[in-house]
Regions:
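Active-site loop segments of alpha/beta catalytic cores
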Residues: 1-204
């Protein structure tokens, strides 16, 4: 849906209404968009990057799981397969609620997913995600960008970081990070505390 909302002046709600009114148009768009995305991926992969990043904002998860499976998953599958064949790692970024998306991603060759936001911004329980999907893909993120990083104390950051490591660090495959970006006014002390905690406790 993210590729299409510009046709509706950036209004995702209008785009979704239009889909239900004219599904045949969106199906044609989806076919063209998939070809474009796969071609772009082929060009990027030819440059031998260290990593190919997929996704964007939370539009994958603002749509229903049915729409995500119909319009997003096929392209993700093809691009991840191409990257795997080229020996390039892949990461998918999708803000917001992502539990339903994570289940779909197990059908792909994706290497890593982020930001795995906890409630209220997302719906991820990190320990549960590690149990369910930790052997299939690497996990990145989960520290709350607002209540912990922006508004919390350094002690709060250390506690949350240690918990994330405990929840998802066993046997590796976890990148300690914030759940999405740090807000503009995030205290520097909190950022440095996150780095220090990762260096101190992040050996797993």
């Amino acid at each position: 849906m993210q590729m299409w909302i510009d046709f509706f002046e950036g209004n995702l709600e209008s785009a979704i209404y239009a889909y239900y009114d004219h599904p045949e148009i969106f199906e044609e768009w989806a076919e063209l968009a998939e070809k474009l995305l796969v071609k772009q991926a082929e060009i990027y992969l030819s440059l031998k990057p260290d990593l190919l990043l997929l996704g964007g904002s939370g539009t994958i998860t603002l749509a229903s799981p049915e729409l995500a499976r119909k319009f997003a998953l096929p392209a993700i599958k093809k691009i991840c397969r191409l990257a795997k064949e080229a020996g390039i790692l892949t990461m998918l970024h999708s803000c917001g609620k992502s539990m339903a998306l994570l289940e779909m991603l197990t059908e792909t060759d994706l290497n890593c997913v982020n930001p795995l936001e906890e409630p209220p911004m997302g719906d991820v329980n990190l320990a549960e995600v590690k149990r369910l999907y930790g052997k299939k893909m690497s996990l990145m993120g989960n520290l709350n960008t607002t209540s912990v990083m922006l508004k919390g104390s350094a002690a709060d950051v250390e506690e949350a970081a240690k918990k994330a490591i405990d929840d998802a660090g066993k046997d590796g495959g976890f990148l300690l990070s914030t759940g999405d970006q740090c807000g503009r006014d995030t205290p520097e002390e909190n950022i440095f505390t996150l780095v220090k905690t990762a260096k101190t406790y992040g050996k797993y």
